[in-house]
Curated annotation (Swiss-Prot):
GO terms for biological process: translation. This is Large ribosomal subunit protein uL14. Binds to 23S rRNA. Forms part of two intersubunit bridges in the 70S ribosome. Keywords: Ribonucleoprotein, Ribosomal protein, RNA-binding, rRNA-binding. NCBIfam families: rplN_bact. One of its GO terms (molecular function) is structural constituent of ribosome. It comes from the Bacteria. Belongs to the universal ribosomal protein uL14 family. GO terms for cellular component: cytosolic large ribosomal subunit. SMART domains: Ribosomal_L14. The keyword RNA-binding applies. InterPro entries: Ribosomal_uL14, Ribosomal_uL14_bac-type, Ribosomal_uL14_CS, Ribosomal_uL14_sf. Part of the 50S ribosomal subunit. Forms a cluster with proteins L3 and L19. In the 70S ribosome, L14 and L19 interact and together make contacts with the 16S rRNA in bridges B5 and B8.
């Protein structure tokens, strides 16, 4: 469950290392984001010379959360960290690589490019 002011690690090679959530997209009163949801965030920590700088406002999709999520088959999925991947306005990832596993819920939300780049889909 990601909400305003939540900090997330970045799971791609755009150069950003940490994000701070500004807003959860998808409705005026939407409070929480889970795997596959889109957020607006600001870059809090970035590598020097990277494509994004500290203070940039970016869109990102959540790929891992520490809060467990119930799947339709009854299983629960939970990760060790909160992580996101930076995306363009069209929904394609800004980076060319994705690090670590991502949730299967991304397939339902039509983020197929992220699924294809990820090393593991859980």
């Amino acid at each position: 469950m990601i909400q305003q002011e939540s900090r997330l690690k970045v799971a791609d090679n755009t150069g950003a290392k940490e994000l701070l959530t500004i807003r959860v997209l998808g409705g005026s009163g939407r409070r929480y984001a889970s795997i596959g949801d889109t957020i607006v965030a600001t870059v809090k920590d970035a590598l020097p010379g990277a494509g994004v700088k500290k203070g940039d406002i970016v869109k990102a999709v959540v790929v891992r959360t520490t809060k467990e999520r119930r799947r339709p088959d009854g299983f629960y999925i939970r990760f060790d960290e909160n992580a996101a991947v930076l995306i363009k306005d069209g929904g394609d990832p800004r980076g060319t690589r994705i690090f670590g596993p991502v949730g299967r819920e991304l397939r339902d939300k039509k983020f197929m490019r992220i699924i294809s780049l990820a090393p593991e889909v859980l």
